[in-house]
Amino acid sequence: MDDNTKKELQSAAFDRLLNHLRKRKDVQNIDLMNLAGFCRNCLSKWYREEANKRNIEISDPDAREHIYGMPYSEWKEKYRK
């Protein structure tokens, strides 16, 4: 498999993970952290760090909005238990 195809597949799998987490609002970050060792906030941090490595400025709130699919404050208000 060539590198471009591999990156396309990885990107598609990541998009599916994000969509899955956006649908599963019942799954709390603390549960993800306890079971898997990462949560939505970790994903947003990793996303921002990878952007910064490429000299792309993304704020923490913007990175979180990308991962959560809405502003983090809105998600917390609606779904955090």
Model-predicted segments: where are they?
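Domain-level signature for proteins that mediate thiol-based redox and metal-cofactor handling
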Residues: 1-81
